[in-house]
Amino acid sequence: MTGVFDRRIPSIKPADFQNPFQLSTMHHPSQESPTLPESTATDSGYYSPAGGVHHGYCSPNSGTYGKPLNAYQYQYHGVNGSSGNYSAKSYPDYGSYSTAYHQYAGTYNRVQSQPSPQEKETAEPEVRMVNGKPKKVRKPRTIYSSFQLAALQRRFQNTQYLALPERAELAASLGLTQTQVKIWFQNKRSKLKKIMKNGELPPEHSPSSSDPMACNSPQSPAVWDSQGPQRPHHQPQNINTAASTFLEMRELFVVFLYRGDEFFTLQAPGTLHSLALGSGTLY
């Protein structure tokens, strides 16, 4: 290493410290080789191709400023003092790596953009084909509990429109989202307008179908209505009619059975006995 420094010291001349902007044809050596660090004024003669041309900084008015630079060969000195030429084409071109990287990145993006079969199966139920036409599947309806419906109905009777803070408070107290509360009030208002338009019962007299506390069953008739029309006060005649009807039914209830020369009579209340056949008299 000492030999290298000895050979470099004499190469420094006063002319090397000239103004770098005086030579319009000179350019910075770091622009020629992307692999070498920026060289100083002491390295310009050490890395010069011909040994006598000194490189300075690039002038803004230079004709070579901004032009593509060709590959060059620069000298290097070993430890033993021998020098040689290093070709810039001995290393692979950086553009080939860049092209290969972009090709691989494009292929990777195309592979990632294609959804997997499992993801495609998950997204397909959102659209269903009905009669050859796509139809969007509706989300399942929200099932409200009895407590939630009762609270919503009471609030709707007080006011049909809720402000944003009131809606947020009601949703938090019932364990619902603000969207669910808003949709319930919208549906309730639509039903109410439809009832009013059809000329049905007024809202205050029409029981709500969504209110579990409302009694929607028909009213039971009064106790005195179930007894039927009042009968005229003919009690003696009614008693006689009932007695005659009972006797007629008793006669019809008697069954005559005959077996040989005997008759078996079954009388109401179910007593079975036999009677002897008398002289033309039947008991």
From Swiss-Prot:
Subcellular location as annotated: Nucleus
Looking up Pfam families in the UniProt record yields: DLL_N, Homeodomain
Q: Which PANTHER family match?
A: HOMEOBOX PROTEIN, HOMEOBOX PROTEIN DLX-5
For biological process, the GO terms are: cartilage development; cell differentiation; embryonic skeletal system development; embryonic viscerocranium morphogenesis; fin morphogenesis; medial fin morphogenesis; neural tube formation; olfactory nerve formation
Mark out the compositionally biased spans (Polar residues).
Answer: 19-45, 206-220
Which InterPro entries does the entry mention?
A: Distal-less_Homeobox_TF, Distal-less_N, HD, HD_metazoa, Homeobox_CS, Homeodomain-like_sf, HTH_motif
The UniProt entry lists the main location of this chain as nucleus
**Family per similarity comment:** Belongs to the distal-less homeobox family.
Extract the signal peptide range.
none
Q: Which UniProt keywords apply?
A: Developmental protein, DNA-binding, Homeobox, Nucleus
- Per the record, DNA-binding region residues lie at 137-196
Q: Where is this region: Disordered?
A: 15-47, 198-237
Q: Which gene encodes it?
A: dlx5a
Q: Name one GO molecular function term.
A: DNA-binding transcription factor activity, RNA polymerase II-specific
Task: Please report the organism this UniProt entry assigns to the protein.
Answer: Danio rerio
Q: Tell me which SMART domains the record gives.
A: HOX
Descriptive protein name: Homeobox protein Dlx5a
The keyword Zinc-finger belongs to this UniProt entry's keyword annotation? no
GO cellular component terms listed in the entry, alphabetical order: nucleus
